[in-house]
């Protein structure tokens, strides 16, 4: 498994995200999320990533209940939201996405994920279940619960 690192909220992380803005998918940029976190310097960073050498090649935001509005997860008192997981194209199919998911699961808390950019099949292969609901942007909502 690749090492997942906690990314701090600072301009260095903004620079690391640059490759994702250049080569990644617009729906997954996380520009607003990072800028919002930089404004609120007291908040803990929700960003995690995997490096290949000096380059950030995979990333995700992992939010806690209360960080975002919640309507799809009423049966759980506490949970995480897996937000905008992305692996750069040249690094896909090398286990980086799996490593990020495994890291999120290591908290042993239920996880809600929004299936963006054809990620539904990937998430279902990671034991997430389709709750047959869509978020306001029309993306499928999936959940994972520890056994």
UniProtKB/Swiss-Prot annotation:
Q: Which domain of life is it from?
A: Bacteria
- Which keywords has UniProt assigned to this entry? Acyltransferase, Transferase
MF annotations from Gene Ontology: acyltransferase activity, transferring groups other than amino-acyl groups
Give the EC number(s) under which this enzyme is classified. Answer: 2.3.1.-
Q: Does the keyword Transferase apply?
A: yes
List residues of the N-acetyltransferase domain: 7-147
UniProt enzyme class: transferase
UniProt keyword annotation of Membrane present: no
InterPro entries found in the cross-reference section:
Acyl_CoA_acyltransferase, YlbP
NCBIfam families xrefs: PRK13688.1 (NF010241)
- This one is known as Uncharacterized N-acetyltransferase SH1739
What taxonomic classification does the UniProt entry list for its organism?
Bacteria, Bacillati, Bacillota, Bacilli, Bacillales
């Amino acid at each position: 498994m690749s090492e997942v690192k906690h990314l701090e909220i600072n301009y260095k992380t903004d620079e690391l995200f640059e490759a994702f803005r250049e080569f990644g998918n617009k729906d997954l940029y996380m520009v607003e999320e990072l800028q919002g976190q930089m404004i609120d310097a007291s908040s803990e960073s929700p960003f995690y990533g995997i490096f290949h050498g000096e380059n950030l090649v995979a990333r995700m935001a992992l939010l806690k209940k209360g960080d975002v509005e919640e309507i799809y997860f009423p049966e759980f008192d506490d949970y995480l939201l897996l937000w905008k997981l992305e692996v750069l194209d040249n690094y896909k199919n090398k286990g980086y996405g799996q490593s990020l998911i495994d890291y999120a699961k290591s908290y042993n808390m239920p996880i809600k994920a929004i299936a963006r950019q054809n990620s539904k099949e990937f998430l279902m292969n990671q034991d997430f279940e389709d709750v047959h609901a869509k978020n306001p942007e029309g993306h499928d909502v999936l959940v994972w619960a520890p056994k």
